[in-house]
């Protein structure tokens, strides 16, 4: 294999390459616009001035230092061999087919697109034909998402549904190898340059992507000059809505789930003194009763808490109150998060307590959801819509329990409920 095989479509700083490799590479200025970093688009700051009067970019420093007095290096992407790559033999609903056809047509026309589809609509399958249409011709495609958990789940599904090699890229993944299909966290896009014929960004409204100019820049750099960007979301953002209005993005909407049933609408439940009870190692009686009643059904229970510290305390109290249950807790700081999530999916864990880390991109068949302190400022309307979307996703149980325990309703709660009802209305449910 050519020693530079895995360099094609990648962007490098000077000292990430040997002098021999630099001679074989093409170069691009490290400065774009008036005074911004080519790689991430951030302005060079006076405080990041070097002794020789050059500047460096602090925003993307972890990927190698970009300096104004040094070029950036890249190796142009090469075509892959043509391949009939789609193994998936499933069928789409009429609603899904409409979106799939629209995507294929827009990719053909190189029309940037926003797919606004409700949670549980089957977005992944709707992308397949557009993805395959390019890989079949020797093209390269990247599916990116802000969350590692989402990327890993997507990677597993794609391995079953496509015959080509696939690489998975995130902060803790194996080194990159060049493949026609790449699954990556959105930050990893900063390492590519004109590499992909199609970049699909899933869960585009999620932290840290939501309206983050660095990651929009990364997506623009990663796609080829004649390539196309597609954004997928269940809850749009102000920036994306602006792009739709200005004609930069064409919007394709799907307000209906794949199984044809309406979205589950959250029920608000008022309660008080959650923090006070927590300090006394107790559960608010109203919350305890609701959990007790839910456990009688035997369905798995996912409980969201707004903060890690509260989640840890809450998990301990839950174990004391429900000793017969197997209880897990996950947050962004949980090292074995993936194993715990898998344990919940396999029903080894019966109650899973989580921060917003599991608000999106994961499916647990038949799950019920309780949001504790839904009024907390960390719960945006977008995250509450996503959390609600965990319920009723499976054909076997398209309904479920969805409770927002709050200490006074908020604009985010009301907006989330209104949005869910509006989607049901658009789908023809009264």
Regions found by a protein language model. Name each.
Residues 108-132:
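Walker A/P-loop
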Residues 248-311, 315, 327:
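Conserved interdomain linker/interface between the two RecA-like ATPase lobes of SF2 helicase motors
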Residues 88-111:
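N-terminal pre-P-loop "Q-motif" helix
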Residues 30-79:
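Interdomain "pre-motor" coupling segment immediately N-terminal to P-loop NTPase/helicase cores
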Residues 196-270:
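Post-DEXD/H (motif II) to motif III coupling segment of the RecA-like Helicase ATP-binding lobe
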Residues 145-153, 157, 167-177, 184-191, ...:
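Conserved helicase motor
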């Amino acid at each position: 294999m050519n020693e530079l095989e895995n360099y094609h479509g990648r962007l490098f700083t000077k000292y990430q390459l040997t002098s021999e490799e630099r001679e074989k590479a093409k170069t691009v200025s490290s400065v774009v616009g008036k005074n911004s970093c080519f790689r991430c688009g951030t302005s060079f700051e006076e405080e990041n001035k070097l002794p020789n009067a050059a500047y460096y970019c602090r925003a993307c420093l972890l990927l190698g230092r970009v300096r104004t007095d040094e070029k950036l290096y890249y190796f142009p992407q090469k075509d892959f061999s043509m391949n009939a790559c789609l193994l998936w033999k499933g069928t789409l609903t009429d609603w899904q087919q409409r979106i799939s056809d629209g995507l294929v047509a827009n990719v053909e026309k190189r029309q940037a697109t926003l797919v606004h589809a409700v949670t549980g609509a089957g977005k992944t399958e709707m992308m397949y034909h557009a993805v395959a249409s390019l890989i079949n011709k020797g093209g390269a495609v990247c599916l990116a998402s802000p969350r590692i958990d989402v990327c890993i789940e997507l990677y597993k599904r794609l391995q079953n549904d496509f015959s080509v090699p696939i690489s998975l890229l995130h902060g803790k993944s194996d080194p990159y190898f060049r493949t026609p299909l790449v699954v990556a966290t959105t930050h990893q896009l900063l390492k590519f340059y004109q590499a992909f014929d199609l970049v699909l960004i899933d869960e585009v409204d999620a932290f840290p992507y939501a309206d983050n100019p660095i990651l929009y820049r990364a997506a623009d750099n990663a796609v080829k000059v004649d390539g196309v960007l597609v954004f997928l979301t269940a809850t749009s953002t102000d920036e994306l809505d602006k792009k739709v209005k200005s004609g930069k993005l064409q919007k394709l909407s799907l307000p209906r789930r794949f199984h044809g049933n309406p979205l589950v609408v959250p029920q608000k439940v008022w309660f008080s003194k959650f923090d006070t009870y927590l300090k006394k190692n107790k559960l608010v009686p109203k919350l305890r009763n609701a959990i007790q009643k839910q456990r009688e059904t035997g369905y798995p229970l996912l409980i969201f808490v707004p903060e890690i510290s509260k989640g840890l305390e809450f998990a301990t109290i839950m174990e004391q109150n429900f000793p017969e249950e197997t209880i897990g807790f996950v947050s962004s700081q949980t090292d074995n998060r993936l194993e715990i999530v898998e344990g919940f999916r396999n029903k080894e864990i019966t109650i899973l307590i989580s921060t917003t880390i599991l608000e999106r991109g994961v499916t647990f068949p038949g799950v019920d959801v309780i949001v504790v302190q839904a009024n907390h400022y960390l719960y945006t309307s977008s995250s509450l819509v996503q959390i609600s979307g965990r319920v009723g996703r499976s054909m076997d149980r398209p309904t479920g329990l969805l409770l927002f325990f709050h200490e006074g309703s908020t604009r985010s709660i009301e907006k989330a409920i209104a949005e869910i009802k509006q989607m049901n209305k658009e789908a023809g449910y009264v």
